[in-house]
Structure formats: C-alpha cells, structure tokens
Amino acid sequence: AGIPALLRNVGLLAGKSNISDAAATKFENEVQELARIAQGKTLVPTFIEIWHDPLLSVNGEHIMSEVVSLCGGKNVLANLPILTPGIGLEALLEANPSAIIGGGSAVSEAEFRRVWQRHRSVNAVQQRMIFYVNPDWIQRATPRILLGAKGICEGLEKARRYAVQ
C-alpha cells in the first residue's frame, strides 16, 4: 500500500522527515512481519463484508482485500470487475468461504455475528469462523490499518488451523 510514502510526504511537507521516516519504516517492518508469518501457509477462502443489507463486498483491488492477501487469505470475490459488488445469497453459497471478515455494517461484534447466523449453510458460519474488525481500523488507508490487519491475520490463522483438524 502507499501508506509509507504518504507518511514520508506529509513529514517532508511538515518539516518533520525524521519522525515520518521512522513511522513509515515501522509500518513497513510490521507489514513485512505479517507477510512473513503467513508466507507459505494454505490460503483461506475469505468473504469480506462491508455491508449486510444489501450484502456488499469488495473485489481484489480494495485495500481490505490486500490485507486479507497479506494475512494468507484469498478473497473469494477478488476477480469481480466492480470494486464494491452487491452479492446475492446464491453467489455467497457458491463461493462457500472458510472465513468471513467484516464489521462495517454492524453496530457491534455481537450484531455482526447474529446477522450471519441466518446463513448457516455457509461453511464459515457452520465453523464459527466469522471475524469482526473495527471498520475504523480496516476501511481506510491509514497506519491504523495494521490494527485491523493483525486481527484479520489472527482470525485467518484460526480458520486455517480449524481446516486442518
């Protein structure tokens, strides 16, 4: 992502390059560590929800999809031509993801999980591999995306471990 470059540019404009360079380097190092941990592991088919009514997701060009890839997940809708496609239940059932990531449409994690319980025929719902992420941490290209990425990586690792049992 272009977050490190943005940090460096803002620091340059503000005359604080030493601070922004350190922040950008720290960000890059944390991203590299997350990638290292997921490297070589089985990809987890993942559905990314950004809204539940109507059901909306993201394709592979969205930053949330990049985070899922970083964590060793595979966005089941990555190849769709629209950045934020509407999804019918049939398409979701066909994709049958092993993990569901989201949180943008829910007031709370409990509500997010409750809404998904209506779709018990989806593998991720059956296996309880539904992971809520604070939308402020994952839906914007800022350094805070690392907070969301860490949660997603933990969730996908849990789904991966469950799949090999």
Give the role of each language-model region.
Residues 1-165:
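N-terminal ligand-binding lobe of clamshell/alpha-beta domains
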